Amino acid sequence: NSSGLPDFLELLRLGGHGLDKPARPSDLMAACVRNRHLNFAPGSRFLYSNTNFLLLGAIVERVSRMKLGDFLAERIFKPLGMSHTALEPEIATIIPDLATGYLGDAETGFRRAGHAYPQGGEGGLTSSVEDLLIWSRHFDRPSLEPNDLPAQLVAPHPLADGHANHYRRGLAVGPLRGLQTVGHGGLWPGYRTEFLRIPGVDLTVVVIANLATINPWRLARAVAVEA
């Protein structure tokens, strides 16, 4: 996330096209290419951008000649036994046992969250606590090729000026009570998640919430501190 590419979700939102308005994969890609300007010179700073992941997913599909969800299932989910994890691109697909996502709070009232965007490299993966713990164990005992993939994901990736970048290759690294944490959060209308690993004490905390007002980042760290 040091490419400088503007976030296509923000570009669409600024253009009046919110997540509740139907969109096709081609619409998302068009939003990426319409803007010819970078936010900054590549490699000069960090700024999270969903565009990076959308384009990476498209590259995987082009090279593998497979749908991204099928590629992930064949290469990662099935070999690891992550039977409750999938990437379903079509929002109309019924996902068994998926919790309904909600917006609002007790004071203003709760309502079902909705979105109309297709799912791709930028997000929309559905999983379970148990499956994410399987994924966490893979970091300690890699069984997929290449075996050094977990190490590659957390390898230092400094900025062009030499300053450290806490965001590595799809994982964020940071401190907690003197220990290094590795993980990533996720959000989509009505859903919030946090995947937090503390390798130094062999601890993984997974928080999956189906209410937008919950803060999994804080919850995960509170649990880790008390563990």
Q: Where are the regions that the model predicts?
A:
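Short acidic, gly/pro-rich beta-turn/loop elements at beta-sheet edges
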Residues: H163, T181, V205, N215-W217
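Short, gly/Ser/Thr-rich active-site loops of penicillin-recognizing serine hydrolases
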Residues: V207-A227
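Non-catalytic surface loops within mature trypsin-like serine protease
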Residues: H84, P175, P199, L211-T213, ...
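Hydrophobic alpha-helical segments
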Residues: M29, L54, L133, V201, ...
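Short C-terminal domain-edge/linker segments immediately following a structured domain
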Residues: P25-A31, D202-L203, T213-I214
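Short, well-ordered beta-strand elements
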Residues: G183, E194-L211
